[in-house]
């Protein structure tokens, strides 16, 4: 309704992974039809990459916006948790589900955010946050050259050779702006707690599907629901409590830096349609609820697109998009 009121023309619906989880749809990668477009927002990213639509909407619980954006070579933006209503979207996890936006440029997604960021009584997770001036601030960018932290994380070893070389060249090119930091120790706990919340919520939300249509569900979805039913209330409560404590530790970096950089994915889109790829570089930020964006700045194997992920502080999306726009323009100049 917000988009229609703003004058948008709705082109149609796009394909998503099974119940917005892991089961891949029929969508292929526009750059190479033998490769996955990523997921779960597969069609949303592919539609923008193939010029079927200038903008699109998806969702992210683990890495379902950032990863497809990286694989398809478009901009994918996941705002701070609670800025965009999830009313009408299939619920997989109350605490982890985010709405995400796709476009060709940072200014594209800022335009979409300007319309969609709004408090909604039908989604109690939404907060009052004014989107006034978000497009203007995005265009204006930071007042001075930003400084970044680059987290390689423990997953750096999983990045394919060509992609690792591309990231190392990127870091070298921005050496005056980037400092490489050791991965915070609590990141390992976040991956564990993200899994507990995600699986428990999948079991709660799709338990009826499992009972009635088990044979129609993919093996990964069946396994997630079974695991989710085994997590205790104590484990779930610990996972929720750790969200606040870990974010307080993370937030300290913004006293001296404008953002955190990391790979958007462990490489280019895998040459298979049986998987939507790995979200290992994304789950931390979905858990913390921070704004993050994938910028199509690099190329990996076979000249396939490769995204650089920028992460910001919660409820600082105006400034965050301005910094992202600066980085995009610096790389394109």
PLM segments and residue spans:
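Gly/Ser-rich catalytic/binding loops embedded in alpha/beta enzyme cores
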Residues: 1-62
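Short glycine-rich, flexible loops that bind phosphorylated cofactors or substrates
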Residues: 18, 157, 268-270
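Small-aliphatic-rich amphipathic alpha-helix that forms the alpha element of a beta-alpha
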Residues: 249-252, 275-296
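Acyltransferase
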Residues: 161-183, 207-212, 236-257
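Structural helix-boundary/capping segments
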Residues: 5, 9, 50-55, 61-151, ...
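Short, surface-exposed loop/helix-turn segments at secondary-structure junctions
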Residues: 194, 238, 265-283
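Short helix-loop capping/hinge segments that flank enzyme active sites or metal/cofactor-binding pockets
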Residues: 142-151, 193-247, 251, 296-307
């Amino acid at each position: 309704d917000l988009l229609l009121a703003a004058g948008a023309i709705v082109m149609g619906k796009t394909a998503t992974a099974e119940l917005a989880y892991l089961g891949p749809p029929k969508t292929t990668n526009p750059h190479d039809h033998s490769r996955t477009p990523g997921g779960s927002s597969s069609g949303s990213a592919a539609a923008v990459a193939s010029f079927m639509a200038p903008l699109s909407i998806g969702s992210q619980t683990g890495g379902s916006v950032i990863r497809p954006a990286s694989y398809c070579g478009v901009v994918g933006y996941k705002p701070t948790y609670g800025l965009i209503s999830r009313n009408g979207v299939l619920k997989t996890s109350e605490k982890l589900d985010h709405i995400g936006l796709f476009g060709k440029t940072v200014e594209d997604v800022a335009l979409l955010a300007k319309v969609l960021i709004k408090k909604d009584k039908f989604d109690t997770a939404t907060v009052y946050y004014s989107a006034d001036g978000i497009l203007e601030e995005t265009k204006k960018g930071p007042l001075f050259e930003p400084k970044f932290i680059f987290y390689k994380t423990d997953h750096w070893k999983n990045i394919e050779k060509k992609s690792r070389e591309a990231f190392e060249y990127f870091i070298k090119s921005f050496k005056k702006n980037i400092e490489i930091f050791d991965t915070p120790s609590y990141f390992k706990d976040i991956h564990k707690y993200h899994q507990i919340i995600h699986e428990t919520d999948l079991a709660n939300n799709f338990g009826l599907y499992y009972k009635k249509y088990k044979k129609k569900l993919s093996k990964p979805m069946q396994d997630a629901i079974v695991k989710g039913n085994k997590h205790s209330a104590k484990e779930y409560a610990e996972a929720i409590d750790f969200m606040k404590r870990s974010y307080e530790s993370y937030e300290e970096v913004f006293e001296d830096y404008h953002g955190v950089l990391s790979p958007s994915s462990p490489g280019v889109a895998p040459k298979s349609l049986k998987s939507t790829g790995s979200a290992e570089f994304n789950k931390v930020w979905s858990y913390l609820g921070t704004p993050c964006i994938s910028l199509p700045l690099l190329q990996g194997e076979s000249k396939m697109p490769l995204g650089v992920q920028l992460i910001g502080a919660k409820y600082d999306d105006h400034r965050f998009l301005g910094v992202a726009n600066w980085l995009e323009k610096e790389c394109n100049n």
